[in-house]
Design a protein with these regions (language model features):
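PLD/PLD-like phosphodiesterase catalytic module centered on the HKD motif
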Residues: 2-326
């Protein structure tokens, strides 16, 4: 396969890896959600499982669009006008498919998320997800129309306020499309690091010589160094990438069907999530990512939030029902 330069980053919980340096990032895992796709007569497409700090998988009794549910409660600060106007609070939302439906250039990252910071509370929250047109800034209708059709993933972590700049700098090479940038006066200096749309000309992207496949890069990182099973969206346009099966080196094998306890089984064609799980039991890494394994996306910027945890990795390994094996 042709080798080429591409832009990417990998955000490891506890270690930030930019391919040129490693900086400690004191993050705390909050939750992972896996939403089911719509399945006629079985699922509405709003059911989901929840993995919290205790690392136990549960099916949540509320639907994902519930205004009193975990997503709504996590995003409550951006729904509340009094909080948004607070001097020491700020947030950004970024997406290659924003809620207003506008078209976003491919020069921006194929990435979606919300980043909130509260200087007074000395904390921040980062929610990385795969859902188009999400979130709308209304607690009662924050979930998008059409959001039930396909499976989606969400990962949420918290961090100390002083780590905000490091996280922002690690995101810069992915050039996310930021649609609202809202912050109080005292947070402005720090949040200006995330004013991508105003400072793109000043960014020096991180470069990595690779095949252009984020998941091949993850598999070959010294911290991971494992074969991977990978779930990504099977795009209707473009050429999907086959499993990566080098004679030497780490394999990256596409998942073809998924089975999630409490939700059921579905095919890759119904799953818009992007995640990978290591097969080496001594290196229990799980990543929730931005980009798909498709030729059209090998030049697209994006990254992943990864966590090394045996319980989470064991859970995600069980999701693999069938794969395109080498």
């Amino acid at each position: 396969m042709r080798r080429e330069w591409f832009h990417s980053f990998l955000q490891l919980i506890n270690v930030w890896v930019s391919y040129s340096q490693k900086v400690s990032v004191f993050s705390s895992f909050r939750f992972i959600l896996y939403k089911a796709p719509y399945q006629r007569g079985q699922l509405t497409g709003l059911e989901y499982i929840y993995i919290g700090p205790d690392k136990v998988l549960r099916r949540n009794s509320k639907l994902i669009n519930d205004p009193r549910g975990i997503l709504a409660n996590t995003l409550r600060p951006i729904f509340t006008s009094t909080m948004v106007s607070v001097t020491d609070f700020g947030f950004i939302s970024y997406s290659d498919q924003p809620p207003d439906g506008r078209s976003v250039s491919n020069t921006h990252g194929h990435s979606k998320g919300v980043l909130m910071v509260d200087k007074t509370g000395d904390q921040g929250v980062w929610l990385l997800h795969s859902t188009p047109r999400f979130p709308l800034r209304d607690q009662n209708i924050f979930w998008p129309n059409g959001g039930a059709a396909n499976a989606q993933t969400f990962i949420c972590v918290t961090f100390k306020y002083d780590q905000f700049r490091a996280i922002g700098n690690s995101m810069k090479p992915t050039c996310p499309h930021v649609y609202p940038l809202t912050f109080g006066r005292s947070s402005q200096r720090s949040l200006c690091d995330l004013s991508f749309k105003y400072s793109l000309s000043n960014i020096s992207p991180v470069l990595l010589l690779t095949v252009g496949d984020l998941y091949v890069s993850i598999a070959s990182l010294p911290e991971v160094n494992s074969d991977l099973y990978v779930q990504t969206w099977l795009e209707r346009s473009g050429t999907p990438a086959k499993s990566f099966c080098p004679p030497q080196g780490k394999k990256v094998q596409n998942i073809e069907s998924i089975h999630v306890t409490g939700l059921g089984e579905w095919e890759r064609t119904k799953d818009h999530s992007k995640w990978c799980v290591a097969t080496d039991q001594n290196r229990p890494w799980t990543c929730i990512a931005d980009v798909n394994r498709a030729d059209s996306q090998f030049k697209r910027r994006g990254g992943a939030l990864c966590i090394m945890d045996k319980d989470i990795t064991d859970t995600f390994s069980l999701f693999v029902m069938r794969a395109e094996l080498c």
